[in-house]
Amino acid sequence: MPLYETVFIARNDVSQQQVEAVADGIAALLETDGGAVKKREYWGLRSLAYRIKKNRKGHYMLLGLDAKPETIKEIERQLGLNEDVMRVLTLRVDEIDEAPSVILSRKGDERERGFRGPKPAGRFESGRGGAGGARRGYDDREEFRARNEREDGRDTDGEAE
């Protein structure tokens, strides 16, 4: 039998157990027709690229299936009728990887939560901008003195206001 990968996105207001129940229903349907679920991954609640049916997030589930084409059509029909499922994508594949998918392998990576890596060296940090990264013709002490004088209530000329 041909191999397929199906990814479906469930609404964000359903629980993970309900998403697992939808996947269990698919597995039961497959087993009655002689197919099998070879791989099953819950990717979690993730942000959507755009709003779908007024939802900004969704529960993602990947299923690796070994089934007849008629059974796959029935699975897609059942998922389309389910109100909790927003989107379904089924692809025919040559083989199903037993290793965790790229989505799961990146999940614990620090880049997942907004970490963009170390800041690249700018003009001043690279040593091309002058002595020690300071601006040309600029003295830190002058700014410090001017700031202190303003806080003391004195004008920058040294006179009291």
Swiss-Prot record:
Magnesium found in the keyword field: no
Domain of life: Bacteria
Gene Ontology terms: biological process: translation
Pfam families linked to this entry: Ribosomal_S6
Gene3D superfamilies: 3.30.70.60
InterPro entries reported in the protein's UniProt record: Ribosomal_bS6, Ribosomal_bS6_sf, Ribosomal_S6_plastid/chlpt, Transl_elong_EF1B/ribsomal_bS6
Keyword hit for Translocase: no
UniProt cross-references to NCBIfam families, sorted A to Z: S6 (TIGR00166)
Family annotation (PANTHER family): MITOCHONDRIAL 28S RIBOSOMAL PROTEIN S6, SMALL RIBOSOMAL SUBUNIT PROTEIN BS6M
Family from the record: Belongs to the bacterial ribosomal protein bS6 family.
Identification of the protein by name: Small ribosomal subunit protein bS6
Source lineage: Bacteria, Pseudomonadati, Pseudomonadota, Alphaproteobacteria, Acetobacterales
